[in-house]
């Protein structure tokens, strides 16, 4: 046992402190708070007081077990969560020397490589620098990709996923596996040349130094013999590997999480790590915080009916601390009726200062609700950027086609759509200054098939420019083959569903315009209206609009979950069992945000394409 871990001694002061720290806690919370040595897994359901339990456990270590505060490490997934926990500790802490180390995985791991690998804060690549390096690689290579914000964001995501998970198919949809490997090596060369590291490099370097340098590993094990981890269900394999090295043989790991709230699979999180924790640590004590202090009994029981359908989970029986709560399944004939009734309720709710929320699966659905609120003068807080469909990758492609069709497109527009769908036309065939199909034909002199493709592209663009707006967009999607090609680039059903939804929004916008020129003007206006950037729209209003993901950790008096029809919830079609379970967990998270009232609404009309009810509601129909 490290010297910094004191032995437990009994004295009146410790007994008094123990009683005070256990006061107000239920039996499960008491067991977690009083835990001292060895691993512990705390399964904390929604509203079960996990932060209260973690803070009390830290205080118990210090006041009862005599642990030095500076030897306690508390790891969270976001800076905001670390700050909140630190503030709550400081508000309740007694007069002690020092305090625990609160931080995110990235901040803790960077402090390690900062000390032992001699990296400085200035060595961290900024988002702008990272995109500059990617742009340089694309300019120097022959990847055939447009150099725009969408491409940059996708490649940043691919790089991160590759570093964390080692997935070699990361570039699917943009680059082949071989192209991605080449791109990745060139990107890393740029980073090394400028002596920069990104957030994912922090983890890789930290793992490397802890693996190879025993004295460094033991130094940090001695420094932090007690480790607490919040939201453990969101951990990825690389983070877990480093965490285990820090814990060492003592394994004083106190991990808190809920497998039923694991909703970040797209970021590389692996809830299986939490599920396997008792097997990896057979001596681990497992505690379930099963009392929900947030929601009324009806809401807690309804949420349990939904999540019990999942197979890969720890069995749990959550109970509400109080009776009451209201859950209503409401059917509407049309989307318009659904909007009218919900917003009518919310207008009165906002006037009463009642904390309300509309939670949707996707940002796209949220934006529709935001527009309807604005029409009616209902103030709201919006936790997503109001992004026009024309700012999405597919929207930008359509606009490029339309501008080229009218004859006022740029060289960048042509490069953007040159191989969407794939025409196997080289970027070198496009003139350096202006669009010139004659020059393109000359570039492919003697290659009849390639010249045929050039002529076909020119004809397609000319046709588009002469059509009404809606027909032009439909023609690009169907006859030209853009929609089919884009669907082929999607790697799963969720991506396909999102793409089709975006294209449908673009087509609806086109129906409002007569000419292509009018549609281009409309798209430009929407872009200017949304030019405030990625900041959250925050006003002094009790009404919040946010996605299921964004709502995690929050609570509201009244929650509306609209549009609960198959295809929307769950998002996508033909999902794998694993994907379906994560979708159900998202729905469960959204349900458990409600304290008093939960309204679940869906469409049921033979005239609606989305007439089938979400499968997630079926257990509730039988239960309610």
Where are these regions (language model features)?
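A basic/glycine-biased coupling hinge at the interface between accessory DNA-binding modules
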Residues: 2-19, 37-38, 46-48, 59-210, ...
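Conserved RecA-like helicase ATPase core segment
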Residues: 2-9, 16, 21, 237-332
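Accessory C-terminal helicase-associated subdomains
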Residues: 445-550, 571, 597-599
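Conserved helicase core region in the C-terminal RecA-like lobe
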Residues: 101-111, 228-231, 256, 362, ...
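SF2 helicase catalytic motif II
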Residues: 220-237, 254
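Helicase P-loop NTPase motor core
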Residues: 42, 46-54, 58, 282-285, ...
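ATPase/helicase motor core of nucleic-acid motors
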Residues: 323-325, 349-472
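N-terminal pre-P-loop "Q-motif" helix
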Residues: 21-37, 238
